[in-house]
């Protein structure tokens, strides 16, 4: 499932690239995450609300209104059944699927992306990746001359963190402790201004979306923990 902000729609596509279909929506989608097999949560550019959308019917099952600013990145924690939503770029609202806010986490930076993995929260600004507990306490932060314009974060279930670097035009994988990293993909691999990434744990594949040419790449990866 992909967002196509320029055309105001969601794109549903099989992992092998076949059976592509579209869900037209009335706003420009920004962030998206899976709730279950049939439902995704979507935020919108300049929007102060979240839609829960049934991907089979294209219908909106719930609208969650948010106060405090426009919504940005979004991540759903299946373990806690809570949504983590960037609001106003400098805070994270933690809420249930009815929109009840459980807590608000503050960030010292303007956040570009967000991801949750079991009991860990990751977010980024343009040049740093932060690893926190679910109360927002920073465990480690990572920066490197190879990253400029972090736009998306994904994890592989064994602690590695994958990021897209928009201006550096590459994909970086960071070790579980944040001490080491590896440049995994570059322009030579077809990476051109990447804006989204997803690590599919079921088949060890990595999906990377380019902004400038609209190409979605599917790479096979070997999931192995980088050294700490």
Please provide the spans of the model-predicted regions.
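Eukaryotic scaffold repeat domains enriched in small/polar residues
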Residues: 1-228
